[in-house]
UniProtKB/Swiss-Prot annotation:
Functional summary from the UniProt entry: Catalyzes the oxidation of 5,10-methylenetetrahydrofolate to 5,10-methenyltetrahydrofolate and then the hydrolysis of 5,10-methenyltetrahydrofolate to 10-formyltetrahydrofolate.
Name of the coding gene: FOLD3
Protein name: Bifunctional protein FolD 3, chloroplastic
Pfam family, one: THF_DHG_CYH_C
Subcellular location: Plastid, Chloroplast
Entry's EC annotation: 1.5.1.5, 3.5.4.9
Subunit structure: Homodimer.
Lineage of source species: Eukaryota, Viridiplantae, Streptophyta, Embryophyta, Tracheophyta
Source organism: Arabidopsis thaliana
Domain of life the protein comes from: Eukaryota
GO cellular component, one term: chloroplast
């Protein structure tokens, strides 16, 4: 039998023998290598006896991971060339000029101001300067205002609170009629999280630094979101049996047994709470990655909106 390879002009002879009406290659033939004249492509045909299968496993998953890793490197390079990191002593006017340039650039779909800003800058003034159509962080006053109003939808929702609610949805947690408690009232997490829980028809309470006997409220919570950055503040005795706990807080504490002498913990005492709650997010690990995922989701939403893609 003659073989043909599309990149070769030379035919090759393979010896066959008949076994019960089926033509099979002779086991003695071991390998043929067919090359192009430019030696840029190689076709190797291995023929072995059926008694010794040793085919190479083509691992698509492993190769796909390598490709994704390569893409990550390229995306990182692009971010470095597109994004701007002003010097810490930059003036507010310089930062506003950068923001204005990104607002006007049609190739930019999202603008994010990394907080906190240096003390000599007016944080609210700079956040207000970001176009609401590109406010993928969701902190523009108009986006927060729409989030607070019934019948209005913000163009973007703040990423960490959005990630908390998305986690609950993906684990089929029921909201309607449930008692939800949010610890913390920051503009970044606490207040938006409370507003989102209200939109889900939960009955919401907010605990802050002036709340008396906070544990009395948390013991009633079917859903508890904590975002204050106080290590292990929420003890097991604060938790209603079967509650669902989302721990946004993260803080380093001393631990001689850990690398560097420190480890990261959340607001909720995980060891105690995990024995009482029906579901809990570990720290570090769950909410942080969800924040990044929601930022990417918001940026994709912005790009689709700009290009009128449904």
């Amino acid at each position: 039998m003659f073989t043909d390879c599309s990149s070769s002009t030379t035919s090759r002879l393979i010896h066959l023998y008949n076994r019960n009406g089926v033509f099979l290659p002779r086991p003695s033939v071991s390998q043929f290598s067919l090359r192009t004249t430019a030696s840029t492509w190689r076709c190797t045909l291995s023929i072995r006896s059926s008694s010794s299968p040793s085919a190479i496993v083509i691992d698509g998953k492993a190769e796909a991971k390598k490709i994704r890793d390569d893409i990550k490197i390229e995306v990182s390079r692009m971010k470095e060339s597109i994004g701007v990191v002003p010097a810490e002593d930059s003036s507010e006017e310089e930062v506003l000029k950068y923001v204005s340039g990104f607002n006007d650039d049609p190739s930019v779909h999202g603008v994010l101001v990394q907080l906190p800003l240096p003390s000599h800058m007016d944080e609210q003034n700079i956040l207000n300067a970001v176009s609401i159509e590109k406010d993928v962080d969701g902190f523009h006053p108009l986006n927060i205002g729409r989030l607070a109003m019934r019948g209005r939808e913000p163009l973007f929702v703040p990423c960490t609170p959005k990630g908390c609610i998305e986690l609950l949805h993906r684990y089929n947690i029921e909201f309607k009629g449930k008692r939800a408690v949010v610890i913390g009232r920051s503009n970044i997490v606490g207040m938006p999280a409370a507003l989102l829980l209200q939109k889900e028809d939960a009955t919401v309470s907010i605990i802050h630094s002036r709340t008396m006997n906070p544990e009395e409220l948390t013991r009633q919570a079917d859903i508890l979101i904590s975002a204050v950055g106080k290590p292990n503040m929420v003890r097991g005795s604060w938790i209603k049996p079967g509650a669902v706990l989302i721990d946004v807080g993260i803080k380093p504490v001393e631990d001689p047994s850990a690398a560097g002498g420190e480890r990261l913990v959340g607001d909720i005492c995980y060891v105690e709470a995990s024995k009482i709650a029906s579901a809990i997010t570990p720290v570090p690990g769950d909410v942080g990655p969800m924040t990044i995922a929601m930022l990417l989701s918001n940026t994709l939403t912005s790009a689709k909106r700009i290009h009128n893609f449904q």
